[in-house]
Amino acid sequence: MNRSLLYPRATTTRRLIGLDGMWRFSFDPESKGVEAGWALDLPSSLSMPVPASFCDLFTDKASREYCGDFWYETSFFVPAEWSGWDIVLRFGSVTHRARVFVNGVEVAQHEGGFLPFDATVTNIVRYNQFNKLSVLANNELSETMLPAGTTRTLADGRKIAAPYFDFYNYAGIHRPVWLMALPKERVLDYSTRYRLTETGAEIDYTVSTNGPHPVTVELYDGTTRVAESSGTTGTLVVKNAKLWNVHAAYLYDLVIRIHEGSAVVDEYLDRIGIRTFEIRHGRFLLNGSPVYLRGFGRHEDADIRGRGLDLPTVKRDFELMKWIGANCFRTSHYPYAEEIYQMADEEGFLIIDEVPAVGFLQSTANFLTANQGNGRQQGFFEKETTPALLKNHKAALTDMIDRDKNHPSVIAWSLLNEPQCTSVGTEEYFKPLFELARRLDPQKRPRTYTVLMTSLPDTSKGQRFADFVSLNRYYGWYVLGGAGLADAEAAFHHEMDGWAKVLHGRPLIFTEYGTDNLSGTHKLPSVMWSAEYQNEYLEMTHAVFDHYDFVQGELVWNFADFQTTEGILRVDGNKKGIFTRQRQPKDAAYLFRERWTTLPVDFKKRKK
């Protein structure tokens, strides 16, 4: 099996053609397209950009809220000189499931909307001709998939997505599509692990190939080769190594080759950063030095393109994070586009990488009442759907770690977001996931999950598996909001005193906290939703953080306003952003800039 999640690279032995652009598009509400032959000829004149979500491009609500099957179609040309190579199609992501057809022949099926997949089409394509590429996608939700939800049928027969999560269920081909020509024998994967020495660094590596020929690995600093080794496993010894660090990212070029005599059979290039990351004595240590995390939970979300990859937006986001003094973000609530990790590698940002395990709670109302402990809840991990959910969860976790394990920016894995984890089935569900993450990751990064507001130190059955505890807390907003901030602060301290008793030397970070603010809303005296109240809340919350030495990070919710399912508690989306959806600062951005640019990197470093 030649499955590979390596990022597409053009080299002396590999060829790439990008297939992004305007494709043809059609909804298929009756799911009749396969039987009607749409894989060979899509009967539609609609055009659709790739990558992008389709939802916000239309002007009618039925199209925006469409739930069910939908089709994309384009054509691609295969050069005659590619004959004799393996021809592979590679999708960055299709939300949430996809069936892929080439010239009417089904070549791939994939479940999961946030990770890449590929299809080998060597024996199906026609060389020196145009070929038809069709994708049948589906955006329905269920309790066995990640993220979790359900699909309802309205009185008029239309389906509608009912997510258990608080972000909009954007759908489409969201990331780049590549046509690749690869050598028959090739590099399928590689991994690295780092050790710092008195004279530099050592890089232990493992290379996976699909053939018998020998492998060499070289490391370059610019045009200078600084280390080399041979074999599918080995060690690169780097003298006077330049380390990758926060906002001081240094990247080396890694070159992996397969040789047959004097010929190079395959060549794969990547950029890596030499760094170590560990937890010791209740602190996060980057290259052996303490680092206090400060930054954001985010979303892949923007006007018009929805969740589709948009490089200008990516660039703007990183410039804003640098301006405000952030050093970290969580990929809430799913793995992001690979290009975002590459940018983090280059800019020196730390990433907590999160699998799309969100919506793992249920309430008779919605996510918000469940978050407050209102409504009837049942254990989410004691249902008939749990075995299938766990299987899909393991598959997504495996793909995320396989894809992202070599990024220096990735410092930790988040295995779930806000699961209902106080019931008896929690431990049986959590244990194999945490064991799998440890087994798959050669760097043994710390593992965590974000703890729901109703999961407390004495009731959470999952926190014992985490290498560090991550709390989502809203004292002063969802709990005791408004004029009673003093009560919110007292309740917050009470809970924190409880966590102090169960951490057993582990650090704790906040992966969510914040309030909604309608940009431009000012009130004197303050009221909820105003800029003044948002700042008062943040000052109170930060004072609580600073009171506890074991608090080692703060990732505010959210970087920018983002879209959600419409409802009476959401005014055209979630407004907790420190920046607007158009990436302009709210008043709170200046509060964070003042705090984060003055906090030392090793804030709260002392620990005896």
Regions found by a protein language model. Name each.
Residues 204-206, 318-320, 328-595, 604-605:
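Substrate-binding/catalytic cleft of secreted carbohydrate-active enzymes
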